[in-house]
């Protein structure tokens, strides 16, 4: 699979302040890529440079083989951008907002109707096309934003916090459309999010902190490297349980009669559970989460940092 985004040795300075420091990463075509980081880490600077809004200090950035510095018009034609804050005209209808965007991209008049129908069908809003944007729910507005970002048929869609402020059901619907775009239209999705269950859906994740890439891999690989599953055991015979944990060389933390045991050595933990089952009053296994990954790497929880 070829890379549609290539960032090599990218640096961005503001005077003496280094916002992004010599980072490199790539995004494969047709994948969903999450770019995470605390506030001030360099995340927005990187995205704005990729979208041709900021100028680089050093390095190279390419989208679909086009240099974001020297081929701005070609890059802008290849990307769609959905910002966190709505930029739709609330007084205009869905259709009118999309037509205005077609004008910005010099889309031939003969193609406008076909494109509007196409993108509104993708987000299930064709029947609502005459409604004013101001009368729409938050979830519907996000779908219009996504439709507008697709009207010029980009190869890469940048989504900045696409589901922030939406209820869980609406968030699930928005993600259904995002996955549909990726799978059916082979559009590359580059997104930021502070919902870790969303990050785990992505094919690859990069975490930036202090202006440098501190992790870049699949969600599975990052969780395997930075988290541990844990068992929480309650017992009516603490002496017997502690003896077994020592026998099988398992570390634990105790609070009252509750024990937290690292589940990394699953075979040994299962032996303890089997031999102690008559005394176990409660048992819970908790999988490592991506919040744990972010905390381990950056020292901050994702909801505090992004």
What does each of the following model-derived ranges do?
Residues 59-67, 74-75:
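Conserved ABC transporter NBD signature motif
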Residues 99, 103, 110-128:
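Conserved ABC ATPase "signature" region
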Residues 132-136:
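Conserved ABC ATPase signature
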Residues 153:
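Conserved catalytic motifs of ABC-family nucleotide-binding domains
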Residues 157-160:
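Catalytic Walker B motif of ABC-type/P-loop ATPase nucleotide-binding domains
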Residues 176-263:
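ABC transporter nucleotide-binding domain
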């Amino acid at each position: 699979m070829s890379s549609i985004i290539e960032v090599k040795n990218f640096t961005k300075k503001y005077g003496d302040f280094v916002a992004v420091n010599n980072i490199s990463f790539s995004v494969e075509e047709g994948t969903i890529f999450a770019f995470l980081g605390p506030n001030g880490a360099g995340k927005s600077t990187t995205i704005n440079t990729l979208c041709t809004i900021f100028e680089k200090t050093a390095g190279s950035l390419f989208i679909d083989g086009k240099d974001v510095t020297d081929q701005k018009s070609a890059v802008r034609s290849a990307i769609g951008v959905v910002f966190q804050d709505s930029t739709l005209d609330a007084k205009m209808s869905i259709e009118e907002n999309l037509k205005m965007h077609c004008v910005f991209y010099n889309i031939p008049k003969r193609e406008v109707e076909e494109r509007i129908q196409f993108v509104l069908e993708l987000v299930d809003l064709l029947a609502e096309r005459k409604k004013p944007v101001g009368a729409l729910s938050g979830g519907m507005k996000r779908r219009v934003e996504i439709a507008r970002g697709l009207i010029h048929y980009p190869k890469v869609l940048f989504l900045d916090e696409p589901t922030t402020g939406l209820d869980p059901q609406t968030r699930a619907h928005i993600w259904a459309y995002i996955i549909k775009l990726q799978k059916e239209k082979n559009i590359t999705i580059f997104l930021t999010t502070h919902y870790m269950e969303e990050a785990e859906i992505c094919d690859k994740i990069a975490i930036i902190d202090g202006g440098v890439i501190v992790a870049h891999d699949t969600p599975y690989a990052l969780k395997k490297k930075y988290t541990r599953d844990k068992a929480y055991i309650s017992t009516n015979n603490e002496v017997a349980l502690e003896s077994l944990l020592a026998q099988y060389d398992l570390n634990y933390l105790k609070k009252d009669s509750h024990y937290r045991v690292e589940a990394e050595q699953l075979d040994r933990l299962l032996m303890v559970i089997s031999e102690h089952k008559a005394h176990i009053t409660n048992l819970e296994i908790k999988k490592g989460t991506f919040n744990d990954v972010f905390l381990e790497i950056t020292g901050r929880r994702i909801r505090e940092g992004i």
